[in-house]
C-alpha cells in the first residue's frame, strides 16, 4: 500500500535577511524547503518529511527543532559530525535584492551518503520532490544514489 506522506529532498539553509545596522534576522529557507512548507500547509494531515543531511552544530539542531515544531520530520536523514548548514544573506540596494552564499561544505551535500537512510526516509511517501539545485549540490556518485 502506498503511503500518504509528502517529502522534499534538498538543502535548507540559514537565511540572514532584514539587515538593520549591524543586526540581521535569521530564518531557514531554500527552494525545496519552501516547497515542502507550502505542500505541508495545503495537505492537511499528510505527514511531511524534509530529507537532507544535517550537522551536529547548534544551528543544525535549531533547524531540526524548527521543523519539528511545525510538524515536519527529517526521516532517517543523517547527522554528520563536524558538518554545518549552508548559509546565505540577502542584502538590499534600493529595491534590488542580492544574495551571497556560503554553502561549499554544507552538510546537505552528503544527503545521499547513506543509501539505506535515504531509502528509509522516502518510505511511505505519496509525493517526493527535489529540484535541480538538489542535483547540483551533489557529486556524481550521490546523484546516482538519489536517482536509483
Language-model regions, residue ranges each:
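Alpha-helix termini
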Residues: 23, 42-43, 84, 117, ...
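Short amphipathic alpha-helices and their capping/turn segments at secondary-structure boundaries
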Residues: 1-4, 113-121, 142-148
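A structural preference for long, well-packed, hydrophobic secondary-structure segments
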Residues: 26, 37-41, 100, 134, ...
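Glycine-rich phosphate/adenosyl-contacting loop at the front of the ribokinase-like
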Residues: 1-69
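Conserved phosphate-coordination/catalytic loops
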Residues: 26-30, 112, 140-141
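Conserved beta-alpha-beta core of the PfkB/ribokinase-like small-molecule kinase fold
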Residues: 127, 132-148
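Conserved N-terminal subdomain of the carbohydrate kinase-like
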Residues: 16, 47-133
Amino acid at each position: 500500500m502506498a503511503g500518504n506522506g509528502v517529502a522534499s529532498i534538498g538543502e535548507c539553509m540559514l537565511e540572514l535577511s532584514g539587515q538593520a545596522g549591524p543586526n540581521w534576522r535569521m530564518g531557514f529557507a531554500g527552494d525545496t524547503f519552501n516547497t515542502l512548507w507550502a505542500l505541508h500547509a495545503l495537505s492537511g494531515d499528510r505527514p511531511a518529511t524534509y530529507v537532507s543531511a544535517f550537522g551536529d552544530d547548534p544551528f543544525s539542531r535549531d533547524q531540526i527543532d524548527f521543523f519539528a515544531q511545525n510538524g515536519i520530520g527529517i526521516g532517517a536523514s543523517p547527522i554528520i559530525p563536524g558538518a554545518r548548514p549552508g548559509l546565505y544573506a540577502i542584502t538590499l540596494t534600493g529595491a534590488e535584492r542580492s544574495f551571497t552564499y556560503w554553502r561549499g561544505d554544507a552538510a546537505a551535500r552528503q544527503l545521499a551518503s547513506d543509501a539505506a537512510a535515504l531509502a528509509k526516509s522516502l518510505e511511505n511517501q505519496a509525493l517526493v520532490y527535489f529540484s535541480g539545485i538538489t542535483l547540483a549540490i551533489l557529486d556524481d556518485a550521490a546523484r546516482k544514489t538519489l536517482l536509483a
